[in-house]
Amino acid sequence: MKLAMAQMSMSGSMDENLKKSLAFCDAAAGSDLLFFPEVQLTPFFPQYAGRNVDAYAVPAGSPTVQAFADKAKECGLYLSPNMYLEQEGKRYDASLWLTPEGVCAGVAKMVHIMQAAQFYERDYYTPSEDGFLVFDAPWGCVGIVICFDRHLPESIRTCALKGADLVIIPTANTKAEPMELFEWEIRVQAMQNQIFVAMCNRVGREDGMDFAGESLIVHPSGDVIYKADDREQLIVQELDLAEARLWREHKRPYLKQRRPECYL
């Protein structure tokens, strides 16, 4: 399959960010799956505590969501935009799963909500009630793990146990964070779970945050397939997701050795 990631910067205008996102979809036509960084339609507002961000909430079923669904159908690809989604009176850090038929087949929501300096996410996000979700496609099974959730190893492990061949991670990592350590974190989890992992980051400076880019694709062996720099770009990479199953079943069958009865 052909995976595409839109490593992009965001302005203060949701309309501009939507137009840019849809332009990335056009550029990715011919790919099988395109996904984006965390909260791609807005500035990274969680860097501020307790602000009124009503204007940034995207209602489920809104024209914005429909625009992405229509574009998925037009381009004939699976599409996973991440946004500040409002659904049934609650707001989430959420990634949609849109099919090439233009149907929203599911919504993955952040499970663990961080609260720390410049990441005041509990001020804005409701934790997922659904846990970690995986989605089937003709070329494989995809799990979605949103940003901070990847720091809890149960996230990618759960996706692997549910049969995912690939985990995609929309994120917002800054240059002030330990990016080299974050790379190794992804590599180790890919190796431990015999799974492809792709992480798509923001770029650009937004007030006190300088987003690092360095989007990453890692093989089930733990080897880096692709690593970006800090510039805005569309990343397209061919992946054979059958390799995840080969590694999990034969080359490194770690998951078969698990003894859950011994774990807390």
Role assignments for model-derived ranges:
Residues 1-12, 94, 140-149, 168:
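Active-site-proximal beta-strand elements of phosphoester/diester hydrolases
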Residues 7-9, 37, 109, 201:
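Residue-level recognition of beta-strand->loop/alpha-helix junctions
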Residues 14, 22-100, 173-188, 192-195:
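Cys-nucleophile CN-hydrolase/nitrilase-fold catalytic domain and related Cys-dependent amidase chemistry
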Residues 16-25, 152-157:
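Short, acidic/polar
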Residues 57-78, 151-234:
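CN hydrolase (nitrilase-like) catalytic-core segments centered on the catalytic cysteine
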Residues 81-83, 94-97, 133, 215-217, ...:
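Short beta-strand scaffold segments in enzyme catalytic cores
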Residues 86-162, 175-184, 249-253:
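Active-site catalytic loop in hydrolytic enzyme cores
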Residues 244-264:
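A conserved C-terminal secondary-structure "cap"
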